[in-house]
């Protein structure tokens, strides 16, 4: 798996992530893509990177990132749980999904979401709002916090 660091912005905050490419990827190709999402803690190097390893081996381009408030993305706050909500994570994932779609390696017509735990609930919320999401998978998830 090849990795390329990316930076984008979500609601004014700098977000840091990675594009994960299959080993056999050739420049100029457009591949289906999956935005891989972590649970509540929003850490890219954990579940998103693990999911990307499995999916890139099957030919997908993947992207993972650290949610707003989790290093190395911006707006880290000492009382993070108070300021990080399902809605802020939905905003971040929606913005990341749009960013992923415009990457040169990505077939923007074949993009989906994958989420673990709270990340799964976030993916369900994003997919319900964005018709560009063509597929969704959740693991160990719930639909809402009520």
Identify the meaning behind each predicted range.
Residues 95-146:
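Primarily recognizes the serine-hydrolase "nucleophile elbow" in alpha/beta-hydrolase
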Residues 1-29:
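N-terminal cap/lid segment of alpha/beta-hydrolase-fold proteins
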Residues 54-76:
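Conserved alpha/beta-hydrolase
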Residues 31-32, 60, 133-135:
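Loop/turn elements at helix/coil->beta-strand transitions in domains of secreted/extracellular proteins
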Residues 29-39:
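Short beta-strand element of the alpha/beta-hydrolase
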Residues 40-53, 67:
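The serine-hydrolase catalytic nucleophile loop
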Residues 44, 68-108:
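Catalytic nucleophile-loop/oxyanion-hole region of alpha/beta-hydrolase
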